[in-house]
Structures are given as C-alpha cells and as structure tokens.
C-alpha cells in the first residue's frame, strides 16, 4: 500500500502524475497534493492500464461526467456497445461497462481496449451471473467467486468499481418489510441483498473490507461505494434507509483513506429538487469531503422518455452544490437499453449540466467559456461563436438549416437582429 497516490501525497511528494492533473485542472500542485492526501480528490486510473485521458475528481476540480453502457440479457450487440464507447470518448470523462449479457470478460476487455477513458464496472454482476449459469442461482456465488472476479477485472485494467458495501443484512430485511414505494432499485444492490438473505450472512464486502482494500491498493484503483438502498422514487428520498446507508458508507470511506486507498461515494437517485443541495452537503459533512458520484439526481418520477432533460436539472444543481462526478441518464432510462443516439443525447445533456454547475462552483474559471461565446455572439462573429459552443457541428447545422442567412444576423430575426442594429447605432455614435 506504500506506493498509492494517497500515501505519496501524505509524504509531501508531488510526482509527475500530480503535476499533470494540476496543470489540466488549473490548480496548484500543492493544493492538489493536500486534497489527495485527505481523500478529497481521487485520480481515476489503474496503474496496470493507464487511460489516455487524465481524470481527477473532487474538491476544487471541474465536474466530471460518467457514461454508462453495456449489454443486457435481451440485447447483446458488441458493435453497438463499442460505438457507445466512441460517444463516451467524445463527451465523457469516465465510462462504466454494466454488461450482463454475453461473454462478459470479452466485452469488458473490448471496451477497455477501445476506451480513451478510465473504465469502471460493478463486479457483483459477473459473480452473480456466472453463479446463475453454473449453479442455477445467482445468490449461490461464493465469497471467493466475488473476490476472484474483482481481481480478474482489476488485472484487466478496470480503474474503479461500484462496491455495495454499505448495506447491512439488518437494513436489507427492514427495507423489504418497509412501506417504501420501491424497496430496492439498485441492480447490484439487489444481488448483494439476495446473497445475504439466501446465505443468512452479512454483506461479504463489509466482512472482508480490509482484504478488499489490499486488492485495490495493489492497482491504486478507486472504490466507489455503491448505494444499494438509493431512493428510486422521490417519495423515498432521505428516508432512514437512504441516510443510514450513507452514514455506513462514510465510515467505510474513512477506513479506506486511512489505508491509503482511493474512494468515492455514490448517491441518489430520485430526489425532490428542494432536497438536492441538502443531500450533497450531507455527504460532504459526513465524509469530510470524499468525492460524491451522483446518479442524476432525478427530481421527478414522471419524465420518461425525457429523463435526460429532467435529471440534467437536478445534476446542474448537484454540481453547483459540490457534487464531483455526475452519472448521466439517457432518454431510455426506466424504459429500455439505450441506443447509441440516446447515449449521446444523455452525455450532451450532462456535459451541459456539469458546466452550469461549475459556473457556480468554480466561478470565473468556468465562466470564461461563456464569456468568450457571448463576446463573439454580441459581435455577430458566427464562426468564432459556433466553434466555441458545446456542440459546434450541430450548432452549424441549425444555423444553416434554412440555407445560409441572407443578412448578417440569423434566420430568427433576419434584418431586425437587435445586435446588428446596436452595432450600427454604436458606429454612428463614434
């Protein structure tokens, strides 16, 4: 464990990795080092398979977005998933392979090979599915099966993993007896809960946490503590199960940081808009600033097939309040496996949400982008403005969708463009 990035930071060392991150993020190497040492910043990578893109997540850094992809039991199309990787490479900062159908090892290795980004997984999926195929029951996987799967995926180059360690057997039993609208919506969490109930045993991640830390330290990979009991309906947000699991996750995160292992915490989920800021502040208070990786949040249950729009509202507010990594949501959420196009729609929505949040969280540093666009828009310098937009290619297509404008303005106002008239009046004043 002595050579993990946290250990090096605690020794006061600033190495080439830290300098590279600091330069990319526009922060001082000393501040970055101190935040890594405290567990407030994580560097997403596997030392055995460094990704092309440098990705650091946490305090004082730009908000990052994660793109989920992967096969289902109903749709196994590797070519399509690899096209989604290309979308992630263009728009995202990290990606997760959530495949549950087909040859999981082959799919994961193909995704890692194609990706320019750090790749994450949920290892219990593979342990559960392989046990189901071999023993006719997913909950029949052994603890050795689970940890062998984790080690195999780390050896393949997986940089971070969702580990549902914070749900206890007692909490699992109580949530299933509760009056929650939807007791459990986490697929990986459900698999761990099923294992605990089938085996009448405590969460294997929880009972073997120290061994798990040793595994991750070998690769300096990041543990992302999953939220098995995250609210799947706005009515369930911040109930005893949601908050109780977050408290346990905070305890586990502190143990990981003490051991020199990088860690994030995952968050909701479905949360009313008026509670989004509060849930971010709560995580930061409980953990001392451990990076928060949130799904959405989605502030309404009624928006499908427009959940990418609805959740981007929650995501922007979450980022402004201090969320560090946003897990995107696509138009297919709650309805279907997403297509390549839907993956891109979700990724773009979240790229915009992340920037909106950063304008608040990082201030002038993030707002320079907006200021440049507005400068050129106000002077009708269309080429300069368009190439600075979030999606210049689509922007140009929209700008010319009725043919090249016949006047200096666009086809919306035409000759009555207010900026054009202001420019002419300003010239007269001079």
UniProtKB/Swiss-Prot annotation:
Residues that hold Zn(2+) according to the record: 270, 334
Molecular function in Gene Ontology: 4 iron, 4 sulfur cluster binding; lyase activity; metal ion binding
Residues binding substrate: 68, 96, 125, 164, 186-188, 227-230, 266, 293
Keywords: 4Fe-4S, Iron, Iron-sulfur, Lyase, Metal-binding, S-adenosyl-L-methionine, Thiamine biosynthesis, Zinc
Source domain of life: Archaea
Binding locations of [4Fe-4S] cluster: 410, 413, 417
Cofactor(s) needed for function: [4Fe-4S] cluster
Cofactor binding notes: Binds 1 [4Fe-4S] cluster per subunit. The cluster is coordinated with 3 cysteines and an exchangeable S-adenosyl-L-methionine.
EC number: 4.1.99.17
One GO biological process term: thiamine biosynthetic process
Catalytic activity: 5-amino-1-(5-phospho-beta-D-ribosyl)imidazole + S-adenosyl-L-methionine = 4-amino-2-methyl-5-(phosphooxymethyl)pyrimidine + CO + 5'-deoxyadenosine + formate + L-methionine + 3 H(+)
UniProt pathway: Cofactor biosynthesis; thiamine diphosphate biosynthesis
PANTHER family documented for this protein: PHOSPHOMETHYLPYRIMIDINE SYNTHASE, CHLOROPLASTIC, THIAMINE BIOSYNTHESIS PROTEIN THIC
Function noted in UniProt: Catalyzes the synthesis of the hydroxymethylpyrimidine phosphate (HMP-P) moiety of thiamine from aminoimidazole ribotide (AIR) in a radical S-adenosyl-L-methionine (SAM)-dependent reaction.
Family statement drawn from the similarity comment of this UniProt entry: Belongs to the ThiC family.
Protein name as catalogued: Phosphomethylpyrimidine synthase
Gene: thiC
């Amino acid at each position: 464990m002595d050579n993990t990035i946290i250990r090096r930071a605690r020794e006061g060392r600033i190495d080439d990795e830290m300098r590279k991150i600091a330069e990319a993020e526009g922060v001082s190497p000393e501040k970055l080092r101190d935040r890594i040492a405290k567990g407030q910043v994580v560097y997403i990578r596997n030392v055995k398979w460094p990704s092309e893109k440098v990705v650091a997540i946490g305090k004082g850094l730009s908000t990052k977005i994660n793109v989920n992809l992967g096969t289902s039991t109903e749709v196994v199309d590797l070519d399509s998933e690899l096209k989604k990787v290309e979308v992630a490479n263009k728009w995202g900062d990290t990606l997760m392979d959530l495949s549950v159908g087909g040859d999981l090892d082959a799919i994961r290795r193909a995704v890692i090979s194609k990706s320019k980004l750090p790749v994450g997984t949920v290892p219990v999926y593979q342990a559960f599915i392989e046990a189901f195929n071999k023993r006719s029951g997913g909950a029949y996987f052994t603890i050795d099966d689970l940890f062998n799967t984790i080690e195999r995926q780390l050896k393949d180059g997986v940089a971070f993993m969702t580990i549902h360690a914070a749900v206890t057997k007692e909490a699992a039993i109580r949530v299933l007896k509760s009056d929650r609208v939807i007791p459990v919506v986490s697929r990986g969490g459900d698999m761990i809960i099923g294992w605990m109930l089938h085996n009448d045993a405590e969460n294997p991640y929880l009972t073997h946490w120290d061994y798990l830390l040793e595994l991750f330290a070998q690769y300096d990979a990041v543990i992302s503590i999953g939220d098995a009991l995250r609210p799947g309906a706005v009515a369930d947000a911040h109930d005893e199960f949601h908050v109780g699991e977050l408290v346990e996750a905070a305890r586990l995160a502190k143990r990981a940081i003490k051991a020199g292992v990088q860690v994030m915490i995952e968050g909701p989920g479905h949360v009313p808009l008026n509670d989004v800021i509060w849930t971010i502040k709560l995580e930061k208070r409980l953990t001392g600033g451990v990076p928060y990786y949130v799904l959405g949040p989605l502030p309404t249950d009624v928006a499908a097939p427009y959940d990418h729009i609805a959740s981007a509202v929650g995501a922007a507010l979450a980022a402004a309040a201090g969320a560090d990594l946003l897990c995107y949501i696509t138009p297919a959420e709650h309805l279907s496996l997403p297509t390549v196009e839907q993956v891109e729609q979700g990724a773009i929505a979240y790229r915009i949400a992340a920037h909106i949040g950063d304008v608040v969280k990082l201030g002038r540093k993030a707002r320079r982008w907006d200021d440049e666009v507005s400068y050129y828009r106000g002077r009708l310098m269309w080429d300069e403005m368009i190439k600075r937009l979030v999606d210049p290619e689509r922007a140009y297509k929209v700008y010319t969708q009725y043919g090249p404008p016949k006047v200096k303005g666009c086809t919306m106002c035409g000759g009555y463009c207010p900026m054009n008239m202001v420019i002419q009046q300003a010239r007269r004043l001079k």
